[in-house]
Each structure stands twice: as C-alpha cells, then as structure tokens.
Amino acid sequence: LAEDGVIFVSIDDNEVFHLGLLMEQVFGAANFVATCIWQKRYSRESTSAIGDVHEYLLVYAISPVMFKEARNRLSLDEKSKKAYSNPNNDRRGPWQSISFTGAGYRPNQMYQIVAPNGNTHLPPEGRHWAMVENEYRKLEAAKRIWWGKDGNGVPRVIRYLSEVDGLVPWTWWPHEEVGHTDEARKEIQGIFGTQTAFDTPKPVRLIERILRIATQPGDIVLDFFAGSGTTAQALLNLNKEDGGDRRFILVSSTEATADAPDKNLCRDVCAE
C-alpha cells in the first residue's frame, strides 16, 4: 500500500470476527479506520431467526492520519441538499443551522452568551461552546448566529450550502445509495447472460463508493478477488466521469467450467 493507502475487505457474518482478528494481526489495531455496513438486501430475509440483510467492509490504512487527509468527501445528494433552505431570503443563499456546542468541558469555551432578546445562555451540562468567545463574536457580527424562528432559541451556527464541500463518509451504506445484491445480479446477467455466473456479486455502485472515497485520479487499485470485474468497471466509470487515469490490477483464481476447462488466465475486461 501507498503511505496514504487503504484496504477495504468485504465479509459477511460467518467470518467477520475471524477476519477482524487477522486484520489486526497484519495491520495492527492502530491502523483500523472503520467497519462499514452495506445493506445488501432491500426486502426482509425471513429464513433465519434474525434476518440477514447486511455485510461488512473492514477498512484499514497504513496511516489512518494520512488517509484521513487524502480521502475524498462524498457529493451532496438531493436529500442532503433539501436540508438547506432560505426562509429569510438571505443573499448568501440556502442555509441550515447547526449546533454550537461540543461534548466535554473546555474552560475557555464556557462563557456566557446574551441573546438579542436579553436572555443569557451557558453551555448545557457536560458540553462547551464550539468556539472561543472572540470567534463567536465574529460569527455574531457576520449575522451567522440563528436564534430560532421566534428569536427565543439557543444559539446555533448558520452554515451555507455554498460553503459545504461534500459529506464526510460514514459507516452506514444503505442500498438506495450503493445498490444491493439483486442489482448486482442484474448487472451480471447483462454482461454474461446469466445471474448465476458468480455467487457473491457486488453492485457497481458499491465499488464506485469505495473508489470515490479512497482514490485520486492517478491511483492504482488492486482487487485480489476480481470475480466478474466489477472493480474494473467501476474504476473505468469513475475515470470517464472525472477524466482520471486510475489503473487497476485484478487477481482471480478462475474456476474451471465446461466453457473454459483450461482455466483461462486472461480474458477481455470490457463489455458492451
């Protein structure tokens, strides 16, 4: 891996705990980044005592600090953009208010704030203001503090949509955003003419999510379990989208079949 490199490993409930121990042995606990949850089904699974509708993506980095600096934010989707509005016709555009407190106690961030209506405010128990007082005064002077529709609320910071450069990735990946197994099987059928060519296909959107987070336009991506070549397809899609020059290395232990008894090692990676 590169110094800012990262590895994503997909696994289900059967081996996730064994894999976690192995990953900690190889990479070390300090290099753990996250365990992402992929919602692989959109309908309830009723054959088990508790329905299985997700898989895991274990994420480790050579340097979590460097990966955090290098990783990309995700574009705001329409649902996220709807959280911003402009009820007061602010010339700076749509905005939303966000909390002005943080967890814990910080002595220099426990000052008293006087609201326009004369009410005084201190941080709630166990919390502190998000900024020191002089920084708060700058926001106040710029009319970046929101006191609620009637002016009787607690101080909140106004954040404009134009200032948001994307969403920090989080660990919950719902099927609406990254696809599900049925979608993956349909993609397989579109290429190979059958949905049974591979047992555990991944939707292209899932791999695209990983690549959007973890890669830059000139990076090399290695997939040890290439399967149907979904990683290659997702990478080429992303290159087409942003003009990047990402390259891939795919590794697969191709199983012998009636059509390929010699276990061909090389095949075309492009499909129309």
Go through the PLM ranges and name each one:
Residues 1-220, 242, 255-257:
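Class I S-adenosyl-L-methionine
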Residues 34-37, 226, 247-250:
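Beta-strand segments within the central parallel beta-sheet cores of soluble alpha/beta enzyme folds
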Residues 204, 208-211, 229-232, 271:
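Short, hydrophobic/amphipathic alpha-helical packing segments
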Residues 219-238:
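A phosphate-binding catalytic loop at a beta-strand-loop-alpha-helix junction
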Residues 237, 241-272:
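PRPP-dependent phosphoribosyltransferase catalytic core
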